[in-house]
Amino acid sequence: IATQSVHREYGGVVPELASRAHQQNIVPVVDQAIKKAGISKNDLNGIAFTKGPGLMGSLLVGTSFAKSLALGLNIPLIEVNHMQGHLLAHFIDVEGYEKPKFPFLGMTISGGHTQIVKVDDYFEMKVIGETIDDAVGEAYDKSGKVLGLGYPAGPIIDKLAKLGNPKAFTFTKPKVDGLNFSFSGLKTAILYFIQKETTKKPNFIQENINDICASIQYTIINILMDKLKKAVKETR
């Protein structure tokens, strides 16, 4: 359903390409989902679509398709905040899975978002911490680009990190007040570290790639966990 191949040569998501790919794929994807569910379009009793946040071009494609389908079938149209959707996905009925009890804290982490959310009820949510610059996914992708790992770099760094020593190298964690995050400084620190070490030893990356990835991931996870622990204390 989803592919990053159209963005790989650019080292990141290109909004125009993303919206075009979305436009090409949305009809066959919906058709496939309906067939897999063993129903027809006439069995639908509502259309939920992502209103935001996200890339404007892709959001417009989804909105236009959803409105057209709902109008054609004469069924309700339901706007969804996709970050709320991530949190509420935990309430889908799954055998053997215990649903969260309100209130609880949720952390949403992706290529474009990093948030800590206090969830009091299904539609009572408050963002109590978020990134003031770059998201976690961007930190992974930019680090991967510096290391020559390609895009998307997150899965590659995660895989290599399992083979390395997370305490081999130390990167300074950004100091941000409250529950907010910042990853731009970490990206810069990693870039300067790699430039410095490869100047002294050209094969530094190749010889230490597992340890570098492990150290980067260890630092990022610690930043997230420190803020989450602080959020737990402040919301008890």
Regions of interest found by a model, annotated:
Residues 1-53, 82, 86:
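N-terminal beta-alpha supersecondary unit
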Residues 40-43, 65-82, 89-91:
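Nucleotide and nucleotide-moiety/phosphate-recognizing core
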Residues 48-50, 81, 105-110, 117:
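Short beta-strand segments
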Residues 49-73, 92-93:
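Short Gly/Thr/Asp-enriched flexible loops that form oxyanion-binding sites at enzyme active sites
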Residues 80-104:
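Conserved phosphate-binding catalytic cores of ATP/NTP-utilizing and phosphoryl-transfer enzymes
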Residues 120-165, 187-188, 192-198:
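Glycine-rich phosphate-binding loop plus the immediately following alpha-helix
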Residues 158-236:
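A contiguous, well-structured pocket-lining segment that forms one wall/lid of small-molecule binding clefts
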